[in-house]
């Protein structure tokens, strides 16, 4: 059926066949080429990190993958199977219904976590504004983990950030801390440590769906678990009372505990990409 093969003779049938074969082959090659190009482009953006998040999530210790409802006691021992995206969880609504009416103790262990904000497990917060934009910042524990950074690298205005992809990076003492984005959207303004927030984002969907972020009674339960996790990560460098039971947190943790392995502690706490 192909030129060059013994017994091949040109005919109308051969011409039609080869034309169709060429069109199919061209379509396949074009499709594969586009897929490779898109994949290559994605790996040069934070989209690649967002796509890799599910694999990264499975590598986290079980203590870091606890379901938000396990923390509140509604689903004891449950490990999250949706990489912290409760919007895709078929049981989230069921467990959330059990928590209706639960009173928030308000316990924040000496940390500042305003009720007007939603909180991400990677230690960022999100706050809504009347103009439909969202501001994103480091939560109080995140700020203390970072301490006095040497520099911050922000995405340019107009850049797109993807949930669990890279939001911004901070450098200190030769270490690079990578902060995950808590929401999908376009960066419309950048801030920094001196402004108390880092990104202003126009979310991809309106109204913004923040169902995967923590609020209310969940925040105190999660904070206790995070402080216990931090205590373990800092041992044996840490001394004094348990962080979740009255131990004071310095505003600059790396500065107050210089002998701790911060190149291990910060990536673990920030769920780094």
Features from the language model and the residues they span:
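Contiguous, well-folded functional domains in the mature portion of proteins
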Residues: 2-273
């Amino acid at each position: 059926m192909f030129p060059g093969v013994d017994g091949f003779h040109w005919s109308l049938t051969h011409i039609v066949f080869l034309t169709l074969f060429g069109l199919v082959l061209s379509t396949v090659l074009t499709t594969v080429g586009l897929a490779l190009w898109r994949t290559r482009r994605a790996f040069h953006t934070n989209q690649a990190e967002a796509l890799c998040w599910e694999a990264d999530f499975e590598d986290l210790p079980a203590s870091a993958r606890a379901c938000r409802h396990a923390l509140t006691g509604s689903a004891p021992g449950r490990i999250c199977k949706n990489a912290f995206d409760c919007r895709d969880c078929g049981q989230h609504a069921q467990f959330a219904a059990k928590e209706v009416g639960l009173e928030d103790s308000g316990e924040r262990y000496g940390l500042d976590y305003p009720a007007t904000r939603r909180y991400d497990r990677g230690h960022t917060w999100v706050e809504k504004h009347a103009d439909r934009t969202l501001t994103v910042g480091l939560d109080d524990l995140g700020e203390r983990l970072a301490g006095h950074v040497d520099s911050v690298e922000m995405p340019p205005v107009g850049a797109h950030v993807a949930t669990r992809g890279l939001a911004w990076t901070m450098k200190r003492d030769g270490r690079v801390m990578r902060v995950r984005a808590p929401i999908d959207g376009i960066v419309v303004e950048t801030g920094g440590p001196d402004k108390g927030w880092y990104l202003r984002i126009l979310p991809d969907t309106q109204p913004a769906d923040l169902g995967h972020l923590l609020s209310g009674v969940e925040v105190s339960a999660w904070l206790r678990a995070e402080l216990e996790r931090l205590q373990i990560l800092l041992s044996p460098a840490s001394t004094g009372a348990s962080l979740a039971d009255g131990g004071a947190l310095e505003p600059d943790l790396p500065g107050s505990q210089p002998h701790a392995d911060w190149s291990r502690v910060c990536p673990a706490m920030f769920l780094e990409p």
